């Protein structure tokens, strides 16, 4: 692969060193486990968490005479992902044998795709920001290719004092290796890229994106150079399994390489591991090139071929993807780019929001979902899938505000009750006496009492009318937040002679 530089050096992303500024160059190879019921070349289950060696067929164990048979659903999922990445779909691709020895690779080779992958060049648009002015920066990251391959098994070295065990449950599970171009120039860009890629495959339903389960992991290629110079020698950081760790690994590795180069040394092309405990990378082995694996077409598998009708049928059924959904939220619902970005970041959040916003004011629904619901979930350490407040319940709270049954302040208290205890919002308001006071006589009495008790404050307000809000706050406090704020404000202005 010929590396092409598509970016102009950005001063904001340069790293200062003893000999001047340095630029990081980052490319990523993301392994995404295909969402399918069975493996790439066998009928064995892909269920996560089963007992060791439960999900193993004779094909996965590489028993003599066992031949691979392609799983059509895995092919469909790869094509769907390619379409979601705006990539070229190759209607003819070839499976190759990648030869190397490892105890958890029973065949002695991995079935992958080398020269002729199923998906060619595509792109992802990432957004950084907002900055202090509220602006976002959109950056296009090129996709070099996507190919299908088998996952390996898992070696376990902590089960016995003198022996290592091998679990082949993962052996033969379908992976999509999504290879980016070296277009990223900072750890923030790399994290944004991984976040966006995970969001896309989750929207498509082609990978669950659960990095903690190993179903999505990244090999991060890092090099440094003087701004605009030739590409440096890259090091590959293997199997990084969290977005936060990706950022930490890049920051450490870039500074390690800069220190070596500024000391007059050179960078060795190697594979490294990231140690999250120490926050540093360490050498694993020298980096192999393609010829070290002796790739050749797998003689047990015919070339994979399909027609344009196959691709078009999949394209027709693609769901709305994050960028399109964000554009619709901004154009049709009047949301800010920031709010729309938050809501589309995860498919589950977007689905929840759309259920709440159906038939209601989109901006009000967005405020409640982002500020109240997501804030409460974050504080509780929960994800949107674990929310105790259903879209119907949150929509019910919004409806009660619109009907002026409760005030905005009472709505916050009501949300907290629903979040912690559950229940129907309307029933809770009725049973706990939380209805808004709309009786102007009762509100007027409270206003009169507070004005009479605070003559000094009255004088201040008459001198500076903008201070009238103090009286509104006191009345709301006196009524336990149940008074209608608009009615209170009107009465305060009338009593103090502040009407326009």
Curated annotation (Swiss-Prot):
Its recorded name reads Aspartyl/glutamyl-tRNA(Asn/Gln) amidotransferase subunit B
Pfam entry (one): GatB_N
Outline what the protein does. Allows the formation of correctly charged Asn-tRNA(Asn) or Gln-tRNA(Gln) through the transamidation of misacylated Asp-tRNA(Asn) or Glu-tRNA(Gln) in organisms which lack either or both of asparaginyl-tRNA or glutaminyl-tRNA synthetases. The reaction takes place in the presence of glutamine and ATP through an activated phospho-Asp-tRNA(Asn) or phospho-Glu-tRNA(Gln).
The similarity annotation says: Belongs to the GatB/GatE family. GatB subfamily.
| Protein's GO biological process | glutaminyl-tRNAGln biosynthesis via transamidation; translation
InterPro entries with a match to the protein in the record:
Asn/Gln-tRNA_amidoTrfase_suB/E, Asn/Gln-tRNA_Trfase_suB/E_cat, Asn/Gln_amidotransferase, Asn/Gln_tRNA_amidoTrase-B-like, GatB, GatB_C_1, GatB_Yqey_C_2, Gln-tRNA_amidoTrfase_suB_CS
Q: Could you tell me which HAMAP family the record lists for this protein? A: GatB (MF_00121)
Per the record's keyword annotation, is Magnesium included, yes or no?
A: no
Per UniProt, the enzyme's principal EC class comes to: ligase
Statement: the UniProt record of this protein carries the keyword Lipoprotein: no
* EC number of the protein: 6.3.5.-
Give any GO molecular function from the UniProt entry.
ATP binding
Q: Which organism is it from?
A: Allorhizobium ampelinum (strain ATCC BAA-846 / DSM 112012 / S4) (Agrobacterium vitis (strain S4))
Describe the subunit structure: Heterotrimer of A, B and C subunits.
The protein's matches in PROSITE patterns, at most eight in alphabetical order, are given as:
GATB
Keywords, in A-Z order: ATP-binding, Ligase, Nucleotide-binding, Protein biosynthesis
């Amino acid at each position: 692969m010929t590396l092409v530089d598509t970016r102009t050096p950005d001063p904001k992303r340069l790293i200062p060193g003893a000999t001047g500024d340095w630029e990081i160059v980052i490319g990523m190879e993301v392994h995404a486990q295909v969402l399918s019921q069975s493996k790439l070349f066998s009928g064995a289950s892909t269920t996560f968490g089963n007992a060791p060696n439960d999900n193993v067929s004779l094909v996965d164990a590489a028993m003599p005479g066992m031949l691979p048979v392609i799983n059509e659903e895995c092919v469909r999922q790869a094509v769907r992902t390619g379409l979601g990445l705006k990539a070229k779909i190759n209607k003819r691709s070839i499976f190759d044998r990648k030869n190397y020895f490892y105890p958890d690779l029973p065949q002695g080779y991995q079935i992958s795709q080398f020269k002729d992958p199923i998906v060619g060049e595509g792109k992802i648009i990432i957004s950084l920001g907002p900055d202090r002015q509220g602006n976002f920066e959109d950056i296009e990251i090129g996709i070099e290719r996507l190919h299908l391959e088998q996952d390996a098994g898992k070696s376990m070295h902590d089960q016995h004092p003198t022996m290592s065990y091998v679990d082949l449950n993962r052996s033969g599970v379908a992976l999509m290796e999504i290879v980016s171009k070296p277009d990223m120039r900072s750890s923030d860009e790399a994290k944004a890229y991984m976040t966006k890629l995970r969001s896309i495959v989750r929207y498509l339903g082609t990978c669950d994106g659960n990095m903690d389960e190993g179903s999505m992991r990244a090999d991060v290629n890092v090099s440094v150079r003087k701004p605009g110079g030739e590409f440096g020698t890259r090091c590959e950081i293997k199997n990084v399994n969290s977005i936060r760790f990706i950022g930490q690994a890049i920051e450490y590795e870039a500074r390690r390489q800069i220190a070596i180069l500024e000391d007059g040394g050179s960078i060795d092309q190697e594979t490294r591991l990231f140690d999250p405990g120490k926050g540093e990378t360490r050498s694993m082995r020298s980096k192999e090139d393609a010829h070290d694996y002796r790739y050749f077409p797998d003689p047990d598998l015919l070339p994979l071929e399909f027609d344009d009708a196959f691709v078009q049928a999949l394209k027709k059924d693609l769901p709305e993807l994050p960028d399109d959904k964000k554009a619709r939220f901004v154009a049709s619902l009047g949301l800010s780019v920031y709010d729309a970005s938050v809501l589309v970041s995860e498919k589950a959040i977007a689905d929840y929001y759309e259920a709440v916003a159906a038939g209601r004011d989109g901006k009000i629904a967005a405020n409640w979902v982002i500020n109240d619901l997501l804030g409460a979930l974050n504080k509780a350490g929960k994800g949107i899938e674990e929310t105790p407040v259903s879209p119907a319940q949150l929509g019910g709270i919004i409806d009660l505000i619109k009907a002026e049954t409760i005030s905005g302040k009472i709505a916050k208290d009501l949300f907290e009750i629903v979040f912690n205890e559950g229940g129907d919002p309307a029933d809770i308001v009725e049973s706990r006496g939380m209805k808004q006071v709309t009786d102007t006589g009762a509100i007027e009495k409270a206003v009169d009492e507070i004005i009479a008790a605070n003559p000094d404050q009255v004088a201040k307000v008459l001198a500076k009318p903008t201070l009238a809000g103090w009286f509104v706050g006191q009345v709301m406090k006196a009524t336990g937040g149940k008074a209608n704020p608009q009615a209170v404000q009107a009465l305060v202005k009338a009593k103090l002679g502040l009407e326009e």
